[in-house]
């Protein structure tokens, strides 16, 4: 092997280790709770944190259970959004939780980083508004009368605090000495895109006040969107993600579209560095489970269809008996009574 090839292999290995470490904090999702943390020494025992995250944990003990919930939200949403794809966000009981999938510069890794940073920002913001955290509360910068004539009141979600904490905790590995590497630039961009998915979908919720339900006075507050909406938005960004490459721009390195004919990506778009594998065959070492045994849709021409999901291997068809409620009747007052019925359905699974 030539010296240049050796150097390239070493760089790829460093990037892989670097990227795996950056996402290891997602292992917190495997814990039932970290709310019982009451001593700084406990932070040292939390699996998956790098040293600077351990230091943040010690300074922010009360916030760590929100970080855990954010990690759980991210994994659950990833599995929902990718439920019909060849790679369906399957997790492992080891580090990193998504296997080596997140160590590659693919669009799947881009989504994982985006939804993870969004999960932390979302969970910490909601914890602020619900009064769980002493360090933050409602957003008091929103007040007075709006141009639309309603009164800002109630508890507006403190998204600024949630985003700031996510930036400090999630981005800490990339902002270290390797922050100029291609993967660090990619991860930082996608982390920020995840948080922007919340910011751009913030909504206004209102309550009317008046006699007999009239709306003589309307008070409103800003609220984060449902996390499912954030997931949908980021899944759309995944579908339209931009393949990029590092390039020297002035005195710094930046990511630019690999295809010069494509328009530049925005801060809200997802970016990736390399094509994805096909995820067809099981590769336990990489954390890829393959698609054998997966349920597929015989009539669909999309990615959930048997032809694509099964990677051309064909599929098995079996008659499966499903139990379901039927003949439901409302009884006064007040309950619904149903019978249990059996129904035969065809189930298709990949060979």
From Swiss-Prot:
Positions of disulphide bridges: 78-89, 128-136, 138-155, 206-220, 208-215, 280-311, 296-306, 310-350, 326-341, 328-338, 333-334
Residues carrying lipid (O-palmitoleoyl serine): 212
GO molecular function annotation: frizzled binding; receptor ligand activity; signaling receptor binding; transcription corepressor activity
Chain positions carrying an annotated carbohydrate: 88, 297
Swiss-Prot/TrEMBL GO biological process terms: adrenal gland development; apoptotic signaling pathway; branching involved in ureteric bud morphogenesis; branching morphogenesis of an epithelial tube; canonical Wnt signaling pathway; cell differentiation; cell fate commitment; cell-cell signaling
UniProt PTM comment: Palmitoleoylation is required for efficient binding to frizzled receptors. Depalmitoleoylation leads to Wnt signaling pathway inhibition.
Family note: Belongs to the Wnt family.
Protein's UniProt name: Protein Wnt-4
